[in-house]
Amino acid sequence: MQKLKQQVFDANMDLPRYGLVTFTWGNVSAIDRERGLVVIKPSGVAYETMKVDDMVVVDMDGKVVEGRYRPSSDTATHLALYQRYPSLGGVVHTHSTHATAWAQAGMAIPALGTTHADYFFGDIPCTRALSEEEVQGEYELNTGKVIIETLGEVEPLHTPGIVVYQHGPFAWGKDAHDAVHNAVVMEEVARMAWIARGINPALNPIDDYLMNKHFMRKHGPNAYYGQK
């Protein structure tokens, strides 16, 4: 588990490095599928003082099996996503400014250009509002459930992120590093969409043929972007 703890620590430290978090407003996790264990950031521990050994290991029921701190308060959301989507290896939650602004506005982040299409196949969806009962009950678990409800049958690695209504963004990937990479991209395309819509409020979404080309050349069965 030490290698996975190091990966999760490094991914968490990338959040302030890329300007995605203020204070302790974020968390990254990763899963060991063979052992059924998840490594996640401890709750409320400052990035400036956090160490590798502060990472918390939990089982799939959220029980701490290793670590001296309580795990992130969002642990149940992470676990719900891992349980539903076997392809996920890492999950990240932040309150990055522009992605959170779309969440607070209750709007999907529109696919307006090729930067977006290189990573997200279509709009980045926004969930519905959680009911009072869902918030007063198992809030973090219900946050995971509403993400799953919103994604439906979408392949999660084709839409590697979402904004939770009035809350903020969650992103995921093949591992913790990939999840953070997608969170960084989500924040950038959220900012670009805000600027573009400000310049031209009547702007149309990216054409399907252009979106398909950009996404598939990086992620499709015959992808040719980058080096093998």
Swiss-Prot record:
Binding note for cofactor: Binds 1 zinc ion per subunit.
Residue positions binding Zn(2+): D74, H93, H95, H167
Lineage, top-rank taxon, reads Bacteria
Q: Where does substrate bind?
A: G26, N27, S43, G44, S72, S73
Record field: catalytic activity: L-ribulose 5-phosphate = D-xylulose 5-phosphate
Presence of the UniProt keyword Zinc in the record: yes
Q: What induces it?
A: Induced by L-ascorbate. Repressed by UlaR.
Q: Name one Pfam family in it.
A: Aldolase_II
Sorted alphabetically, the keyword list is:
Carbohydrate metabolism, Isomerase, Metal-binding, Zinc
Q: Cellular component GO terms, alphabetically?
A: cytosol
State the active site.
D118, Y225
Check the record and name the InterPro entries matching this protein.
Aldolase_class_II_sugar_metab, Aldolase_II/adducin_N, Aldolase_II/adducin_N_sf, UlaF
GO BP terms in the entry: L-ascorbic acid catabolic process; pentose catabolic process
Q: What is its EC number?
A: 5.1.3.4
Q: Which cofactor does it need?
A: Zn(2+)
Pathway(s):
Cofactor degradation; L-ascorbate degradation; D-xylulose 5-phosphate from L-ascorbate: step 4/4
Q: Name one GO molecular function term.
A: aldehyde-lyase activity
Please state what class of enzyme this protein is: isomerase
Q: Kindly indicate where the leader peptide sits in this chain.
A: none
Similarity section? Belongs to the aldolase class II family. AraD/FucA subfamily.
- Cite the NCBIfam families for this sequence: PRK08193.1 (NF006047), PRK12348.1 (NF009003)
User: What role does it play?
Assistant: Catalyzes the isomerization of L-ribulose 5-phosphate to D-xylulose 5-phosphate. Is involved in the anaerobic L-ascorbate utilization.
Q: What is this protein called?
A: L-ribulose-5-phosphate 4-epimerase UlaF
Identify the gene encoding this protein: ulaF
